[in-house]
Structures are given as C-alpha cells and as structure tokens.
Amino acid sequence: MAIKRPKGTQDHLPDGSPKLSLDTRAAAFTFVRETARRVLERAGAQFTDTPLFEEAELVQRGVGGSTDIVRKEMFTVYYFGDHGGFILRPEGTAGLVRSYLQNGLKQLPAPLKLWTHGPMFRAENVQKGRLRQFHQVDYEVLGSADALVDAEAIALMTEVVRALGVQKVKVKLGSIGDPEDREAYNTYLRELFTPHLEALSDDSKDRLNRNPMRILDSKSESDQTLIAQLGVRPMLDFLGEGARTHFEQVQAYLNAWDVSYEVDPSIVRGLDYYRRTAWELHHEGVGAKSALGGGGRYDGLAQELGSKEVVPGIGWAFGIERLLLAMDAEGVALPETSGPLLYVAAMDDENVTYAATVALTTRRTARAEFAYRAMKPAAAFRDAERRGARFIALIGSDEVAQDTLSIKNLQTGQQSKVQTRDLQAFLAGQADQHSPAIPHDPTPQEKA
C-alpha cells in the first residue's frame, strides 16, 4: 500500500503539477507571505519566528484551559523518555509573547511591532477551510494599550487582504471589556443558563462553570437555538466606562480612515487572554463559519506567562489556506510565475561544463538554468519552452572557439550572436521585460 500524507494536511506543489489548485500551489503561499511582508514591514513590523513546538504549559496558561484548543485540539509531542510535555503550536500569539519576555525585547522601542508566518496544528474535524496543519500570517504589537494601536492593527489586516486582491471582506468588530466587565457578564450568563442546564450540550455544561462566555460561540445547533430563545444580552451591554470609551475611540479612528466595519455584539473570542477590542474578518467563500481570521487585545497574557509587569498587546492572524479560498472564490488570479531568463544547452558532451559555467555566471544577476547533458537543438528548444525560458543559448565547438553565444528569443524568434563577455549586458537590457512575478528580496549582486 502506498504511503499517503496524513489526513488534514496538504502538499504545496510546484507549478505544472497535475493535481494543482490555488490552495496547494506553492507559489500562491509565497505570494501571500511576500505581500504580507511588504505591507507589514512598511508599517514598521519586524519579522520574528518561534519554535514549532512549545511547552504544553505555555498553551494551557496562555490560551486557557477551558478552550477547545487545550481540551480537544492539541497535538502532543512524545520523544524518548518524555511524557508529553510539549505540543505542536496551535496558534502563534502565546509563543511570540513568550519570546518577547524570554529574550528581553521590552528593551526595544515601544510599541514593538512583530510579524511572522508558518504552520500551526490543531486536531480539528477536517472540512473545507479547516485543516489539522494550516498556515498563518500573524501580526502582534506589544507595549501599548492605546486605541490607536488597535485601529491600526485592524486597518493593516484589511490592507494585507486587499493587497492580495480580496475585496469582499467584512470586519465584524466587538469588545469583550475589561476583566471586571467579563466577570459581571459571566455572572449574568450563569444565572441565565443554569435553569436550562439540561438543554445545553455536554461541552457547554462544562463551560458554564469554567467560562460561560464560551457557550455563546458553541458549535452546537441546540445551544445556538437556546441562546436565541433566551434573548441573551450582548457583552457590549456590560462594558465599563474605560472599555466603552476605548471601543468608541477605536471606531472613531476607523471612521477617520474609511475602514469599513460593522459592530457585532456576538463577537466572542475563543481564547481566554483577550481584553477589550476583538474582531473577525469574514468572507463567504471560505466554508465553515466564513472567518478568514481575527484578532484582539490581550493585555493580560504576559502576566499569565510569568511577567511581573503588565505588557499591553494586540494582534491578529489569518489562515493562508482560507485566504486562498477567498481569492479563488473572487476569481483573483495570481501573477504568472516566470521561467528562467536564459536556458543554456551544450550540443556535445565536451562542452557541457562550459554551458554550465555560462549559466552559473548568469545567475549573478538573473535566473538561468542549463541542460545536464548534451542535447540536440530540437530537444533543447522543447526543454527550454517547457521550462518557460525566454532565451536559449546553444553552445557547440564553434561557439567555444569563438567565445560567442548563439542566443534566440523564444517569444519573438529573434536570433543574436553575443560575445560571452557581453552576455550580462545583453541580458540586463531584457531584465525589465522579464521581472519575476513573485516579489523577492534582492540578492547581494542585485543590491550592488
């Protein structure tokens, strides 16, 4: 029996693969990451990264023991004599805050803007837009409790998504108040739901004591029916003066910047460390629950992880796979990836090394590939065209003796005879017509 990839995972495939789709196209993931990098780094965010596995206690304390993530969805790591003290990270925020505290990043100018991307792991039921290994872009700001920081974070999230060509998104904005506001709301919910305990799902019965607010985002249809029947008051009704003023300020900034949003009293974040601002970004084309991602403020997280000081923080994340589904639903076409600018082939065995040297030299300034064995011209042309090359250089004994290259433009059919020493200048004149479709960081040679 052939070994297959685990359920709930995907291979990211090169262009031209027979089973290619937008959400399995490796170039699509590169495009999303590079677009996010450009937008976020222009806003002052710095890239960081954390391990794929962390201490289980980090997630238990940082995410919250009452969440589905901790109770049902963690992948535990076992090795040698270990007894399961590590987990594959289910989200990025707790690890980034742990890194901030452990590495003394509070010494850097505040607020500190960080961003990252990478795989996350949750043992979820697999469905459209829900995978067990999925990929996120994550943005965090540490060191400021200002409402202006919240508004900027929301604006940046929408800017990244729109830069990717996705327009039909909706920001659903809410607030879950301060700890005392949440406690008052939880007391209200316990009193409301306790007489109807038998009508709750088993999960929600457990949540009633641990974290009643989590009942409101239950996936159980019977729970949602009961919530509607009881006419549950929204969290916004319980905001104290500080949280309410903060929420109004966030909206004022968004209005000033023409960032479209709707206030949604039902927004309840599933993670226990959130305070005040919370939001979700929705798109109808992504399947389950339609959320591309979300974010919120988590001023209590650093102390939960052992900090002696309050470290205000806010952040967001979106799933790359879900975003690609939204792009597909809107018919967004990725820029075409380009093949090599130059393909070099030797026509006889003794000149293969020479051809390879020409290609390697060309790579100082442009993308080039070469044939690993001697080829007849017809076969070389076919191979170059399959690879999407723009130019082909055929090298035989005459070319080597004369130190020249016979170059043909595969798009126009134009042929040129170029001195080998002039190849870089010849190709430089073509570079602006053959720039890569996927944005990239310049090489040291390109910087020079």
Swiss-Prot record:
Its EC number is 6.1.1.21. It is an enzyme of class 6 (ligase). Pfam families: HGTP_anticodon, tRNA-synt_His. GO terms for molecular function: ATP binding; histidine-tRNA ligase activity. GO terms for biological process: histidyl-tRNA aminoacylation. The keyword ATP-binding applies. Keywords: Aminoacyl-tRNA synthetase, ATP-binding, Cytoplasm, Ligase, Nucleotide-binding, Protein biosynthesis. CDD domains: HisRS-like_core. InterPro entries: aa-tRNA-synth_II, aa-tRNA-synth_II/BPL/LPL, Anticodon-bd, Anticodon-bd_dom_sf, His-tRNA-ligase, HisRS-like_core, HisRS/HisZ. It catalyses: tRNA(His) + L-histidine + ATP = L-histidyl-tRNA(His) + AMP + diphosphate + H(+). Disulfide bonds: none annotated. It is found in: Cytoplasm. One of its GO terms (cellular component) is cytoplasm. It comes from the Bacteria. Residues 1-20, 428-448 are annotated as: Disordered. Homodimer. NCBIfam families: hisS (TIGR00442). Belongs to the class-II aminoacyl-tRNA synthetase family. This is Histidine--tRNA ligase. The gene is hisS.
